[in-house]
């Protein structure tokens, strides 16, 4: 049975770093699987490795995810063998959330993001 997934983004207007600096308009990409119970007591939060993505289980295509840098490893979720119907983390029983880390390259604010307001962090134009 195909794993049903839903990829979304959560927006944070201002995110304060430990250094005191503020990041503005932070986007956090995440994917959910299953259904949250009425009591909200069946949620499981799974974090990926530093080089992973929020694409935990199921199948994905570049056409459905045009905003992220694509590679073949993204076509099948990195924990597809463990998350899904009748698997170790059964999505008919649990509501699973996997978010991409801040600074990641797969849809969350990171090195691929355009930060117009942070021009003081960019290099000046160099004429030949």
Enumerate the language-model features and the residues they cover.
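Single conserved hydrophobic/aromatic residue that forms the stacking wall/gate
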Residues: 120, 125-128
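Catalytic-loop region of hydrolases
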Residues: 1-43, 55, 59-60
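Hydrophobic pocket-lining residues within nucleotide cofactor-binding pockets
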Residues: 15, 50, 123
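Residues that form or immediately flank small-molecule/cofactor binding pockets and catalytic motifs
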Residues: 14-15, 101, 128
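N-terminal cap/lid subdomain of alpha/beta-hydrolase-fold enzymes
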Residues: 31, 41-112
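A short alpha->loop->secondary-structure connector
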Residues: 115-118
């Amino acid at each position: 049975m195909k794993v049903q997934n839903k990829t979304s983004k959560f927006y944070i207007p201002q995110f304060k770093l430990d250094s005191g600096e503020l990041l503005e308009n932070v986007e956090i990409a995440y994917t959910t699987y299953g259904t949250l119970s009425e009591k909200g007591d069946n949620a499981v939060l799974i974090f990926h490795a530093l080089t992973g993505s929020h694409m935990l289980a199921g199948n994905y295509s570049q056409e459905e995810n045009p905003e992220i840098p694509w590679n073949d490893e993204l076509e099948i979720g990195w924990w597809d063998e463990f998350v899904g119907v009748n698997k170790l983390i059964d999505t008919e029983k649990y509501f699973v959330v996997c978010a991409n880390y801040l600074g990641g390259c797969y849809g969350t604010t990171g090195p691929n993001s355009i930060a117009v307001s942070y021009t003081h962090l960019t290099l000046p134009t160099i004429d030949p």
